[in-house]
Swiss-Prot record:
The gene is fusA. GO terms for molecular function: GTP binding; GTPase activity; translation elongation factor activity. This is Elongation factor G. GTP binds at residues 17-24, 81-85, 135-138. HAMAP family: EF_G_EF_2_B (MF_00054_B). The keyword GTP-binding applies.
């Protein structure tokens, strides 16, 4: 296969969904049918190939996204299996950043669940073309048509139904392919490897005709020539329909919807065909955004094998046999083991040691990789998640990833003082792997504090510390990660001088602090940031080389706010004026001046305390509704919606995280164990003043 041609044959896809929708099972079946896995792993038996960390096998949930390469027809499919639990949203986010397409798996019984919405929004953010697989069609209560309606209503997406289920619940036996207008039926033996095309059953003919007409109405809109043909009553060919479905999927005009039961081995091969037929190759994506290091110019770089090398490091993982592995997605050029590249974010050279193609937890050594490939590199010293690796002569920085702020924190200490150093090493390794996990030291108590996206997230970190690094730790009570912000703009003019003998220090800064939501001309790339710095210095009032000192000072000092010492977020600092001294000024002097300006200026901005608000969804039988709503209200919750789902009710509410500790036990006792809930971080909001007073008093 020629190198250029190879790009057309690659599909980089993610499989993402709500917890328990059947992602890992679907991926397992894909590996089985593409010949990469000789035994089907079952999640509920703890044997799934993709779930390879011990905790995943025990809990039956996928925690880290394992990358796997397999082949179908003449195509190479790189699959990233992503976690569906809300505490691991960061894993989904970073996978989506490097993928070209995704398969969203939905539970045929539950339909679109809260995490499905979150993942969908993340995929929207990165413009990832995707298709939908309605799984678990063999389960009691599965309803394909309701699921399609939910995709429309809840996700605001345009579903294009290309398959219909044949049989329902335990009688589910196959699908109707609306492109070929044939039924595909699985016989129960041979693990679903054998299936047969048949005529559409008589009792489904009308339904198939109805959905075929809907399909054609949607796809012909994309091509005037085919539309004319269709409207004049001519036959639209299978090939034409496939091309239009592909074009519409890649341009996100609609999302193809397929169905099946991965657990019962039905519907997986047509899903693979659809991945190959309809999801984009790297060539279809065409470009990647980045910046030329030499000129500082932002531009679109072509995804091509003939361009100089560039790649994005999207995951770091500790492998018990190889050590630290850095997963990269190559966007342009090629790379060979032993070559030197540059990390353009840190300006450090890296030498490529071993290069591996990963299959869940098995690895294959390779000597060369090129644009479109997803590979793991061993032996990189300075590269972390989100960094760019680039050709040394033609340096580029690819668009960075954004990582959410942690919402929960705990104090940890080793059970024996001998383990103190080991614990420090373990936590720094784990933080390098996971950018949504942070480690810091409390300056007042000297305690080590770990911060993450939820209780399960931190539980698993502590578990990994015990298993992988043999460190036993005592843990404190979970604490909410409060934040501070300002609510009005203020200006401060501060001069720092120290000129009492010896080398002096002098720096004057004039800074405007303002709430981000009040900034009129905020650039697109700053819209998701929690702190924005801008210099509007003209005429050299502050020399260019001192301005980074101002930004560094503000970045450091904002970690301890002025109300209760929590980090300050959601504000912009604009350096508008200043002064310097030829001899006594330095970067350090401007750093000190910026810190002092912050301390003096922030109290004038009417600072407020913020708390994380969680979107909580409770699914409960009717009879417990009253008690559950009453309890959510008592937790300062705001009910957003109440919807029937089957014979249950779904209550959605926004509730402060501080009020949600121990909720699982309360819900169990309120509903005799019949209700379930999920929660996900929504936003930060101001803390009511009486609650803020209690928080300040505790600090």
């Amino acid at each position: 296969m020629s190198k250029i041609n190879k790009l057309e044959h690659i599909r980089n896809i993610g499989i993402c969904a709500h917890i328990d929708a059947g992602k890992t099972t679907t991926t397992e079946r894909i590996l089985y049918y593409t010949g990469k896995s000789h035994k089907i792993g079952e999640v509920h038996e703890g044997g799934a190939t993709m779930d390879w960390m011990e905790q995943e096998q025990e809990r039956g949930i996928t925690i880290t996204s394992a990358a796997t390469t397999c082949r179908w027809q003449d195509k190479i499919i790189n699959i990233i299996d992503t976690p569906g639990h809300v505490d691991f949203t960061i894993e989904v986010e970073r996978s989506l950043r490097v993928l070209d397409g995704a398969v969203a798996v939905f539970d045929g019984v539950a339909g679109v669940e809260p995490q499905s919405e979150t993942v969908w929004r993340q995929a929207d953010k990165y413009n990832v073309p995707r298709m939908c697989f309605v799984n678990k069609m063999d389960r009691m209560g599965a309803d394909f048509y309701r699921c399609v309606e939910m995709i429309k209503d809840r996700l605001g997406a345009k579903p294009l139904v290309i398959q219909l289920p044949v049989g329902i619940e335990e009688n589910f036996k196959g699908i109707i392919d609306l492109v070929k207008m044939k039924a595909v039926i699985w016989k129960d033996e041979s693990l679903g490897a054998k299936y047969f095309e048949e005529h559409i059953p008589a009792d489904m003919k009308d339904k198939a005709e109805e959905y075929r007409a809907k399909l054609l109405d949607m796809v012909v809109e994309l091509d005037d020539h085919v539309m004319e043909k269709y409207l004049s009553g001519e036959e639209v060919t299978e090939e034409e329909i496939k091309i239009l479905i592909r074009n519409g999927t890649i341009s996100a005009a609609f999302y193809p919807v397929l169905c099946g039961s991965a657990f019962k081995n039905k519907g997986v091969q047509p899903l693979l065909d659809a991945v190959v037929d309809f999801l984009p190759s790297p060539i279809d994506i065409g470009i990647v955004k980045g910046m030329e290091v030499n000129t500082g110019e932002e531009k679109d770089f072509p995804i091509s094998i003939t361009e100089p090398f560039s790649a994005l490091a999207f995951k770091i993982m500790n492998d018990p046999f190889v050590g630290s592995l850095t997963f990269i997605r190559i966007y342009s050029g090629k790379i060979t083991s032993g070559a030197s590249v540059i990390n353009t974010v840190k300006n450090k050279r890296e030498k490529i040691g071993r290069m591996l193609l990963m299959h869940a937890n098995n690895r294959e050594d390779i000597k060369e990789a090129s644009a479109g490939d997803i590979v793991a590199l061993a032996g990189l010293k300075d590269t972390s998640t989100g960094d760019t690796l680039s050709d040394i002569d033609t340096q580029v920085v690819l668009e960075r990833m954004e990582f959410p702020e942690p919402v929960i924190e705990l104090a940890v200490e080793p059970k024996s003082t001998a383990d103190q150093e080991k614990m420090g090493l373990a936590l720094s390794r784990l933080a390098a792997e996971d950018p949504s996990f942070r480690v810091s030291t409390d300056h007042e108590t000297g305690q080590t504090v770990i911060k993450g996206m939820g209780e399960l997230h931190l539980e698993i970190i502590i578990d990994r510390m015990r298993r992988e690094f043999k460190v036993e730790a005592n843990i404190g009570v979970p604490q909410v990660a409060y934040r501070e912000t300002i609510t009005k703009a203020c200006e401060i003019d501060y001069t720092h001088k120290k000129q009492s003998g010896g080398a002096g220090q002098f720096a004057r800064v004039k800074i405007i602090f303002e709430p981000l939501k009040e900034v009129k001309d905020l650039k697109d790339e700053d819209k998701n940031k929690t702190f924005v710095f801008e210099s509007k210095i003209v005429g050299g009032a502050v020399p260019k080389e001192y301005i980074p000192g101002v930004e560094k000072g503000l970045n450091n000092i904002r970690e301890t706010g002025v109300i209760a010492g929590y980090p300050m977020i959601d504000f912009k600092a604009t350096l508008v004026d200043g002064a310097f001294h030829d001899v006594d000024s330095s970067v350090l002097a401007f750093e000190i001046a910026a810190k002092a300006a912050f301390r003096e200026g922030m109290p004038k901005g009417n600072p407020k305390l913020l708390e994380p608000i969680m979107k909580v969804e409770v699914i409960t039988p009717d009879e417990y509704m009253g008690d559950i709503i009453g309890d959510l209200n008592s937790r300062r919750g705001q009910i957003q919606s109440m919807d029937p789902r089957g014979n249950a009710q779904v209550v959605t509410a926004n509730v402060p995280l501080a009020e949600m500790f121990g909720y699982v036990n309360m819900l169990r006792s309120l509903s005799q164990g019949r209700a379930q809930f999920s929660m996900i971080f929504s936003h930060y909001d101001q803390v009511p003043s009486q609650v803020a007073d209690i928080i300040k008093a505790k600090k």
